[in-house]
Amino acid sequence: MPEAQLDRFLMKIKLGYPKLEDEIKIINRFKNTNQKNLSKSIKKIIKKKTLKELMDIANQIHISDQMTTYAAQIVHATREHGKIYLGGSPRASLALINTAKVAAILAERDFMTPDDIKYMAPFILNHRIILTPEAEMEGLTEEEVIQELLETIEVPR
């Protein structure tokens, strides 16, 4: 997929394969399901009102100028890192801030910390960067290069 399209996906989460028992459960759940009626079997897990309330909470998370700068520095560093051929776009910076808000909410805080940003960075950046051929020949992964990059950026206090 072209880089511009990949950049529109919020995150890349690597799940791996299910255990044998779990795969059997998946097969059993769907083996007699009529594919045309599959969408009817999907259950609502959240009400619109609850979703709006959660979005309102996310909009109330305090994001200091230091956190904004830190997120931007991380993404900007992907554009200058020697092992990265193509770095993250401004869309990556926005995604990093927005997902770090969720990390703060899950930690039951009304403010963002550097740890929220650092935690989300691999999920946000791993599909938005392209490693250099040399880095790939070394066997490096996007996640390893992102961790290396995070260690080079001063964490705000």
Residue ranges and their predicted role:
Residues 78-157:
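C-terminal engagement/docking regions of AAA+ P-loop ATPases
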Residues 1-61, 65-73:
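Conserved AAA+ ATPase core "coupling" helix
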